Amino acid sequence: QVPFAPRPVIPGAFVPIVSQNFDLNGVDGSYTFSYESADGSARQESGVVNAPGTPLEAQAVQGSYTYVGTDGVPVQVNYVADENGFQPVGNVVAPAISRAVAAQVAQARAEGPILPGVPTPIPFRGRPF
């Protein structure tokens, strides 16, 4: 065994996708997608661009995912990701972690940029090629 090497991932049985949907609105940057697998795992997400064309333009996403953990317990996570960061809520997300993330976002917002004069990144516009 090699020290500090990652354990190999041994794929399990093939799990078919029983439903899927993807809709991209190339005009305003909004999208939705979802899928469900035969093993009961699923994911859905939708996103919109808030304040388009302004300095406050930002992608806002909300969604959820579910699966059965290795211990047989169903896992469900709902989330929002926006200008306030990634905010997960679910039966595997400890409330203390959610509070710590919220505190970090508030602190970063209060502190402002690390270096004055560093340009603001250009917002990502998820458009097809």
UniProtKB/Swiss-Prot annotation:
Highest rank taxon of the organism: Eukaryota
Transmembrane segments: none
Positions of post-translational Pyrrolidone carboxylic acid modification: Q1
PROSITE patterns linked: CHIT_BIND_RR_1, CHIT_BIND_RR_2
Sites carrying sugar chains: T120
Residues annotated as domain Chitin-binding type R&R: 28-98
Gene Ontology MF: a single term: structural constituent of chitin-based larval cuticle
Presence of the UniProt keyword Glycoprotein in the record: yes
Protein name listed in UniProt: Endocuticle structural glycoprotein SgAbd-9
Species of provenance: Schistocerca gregaria
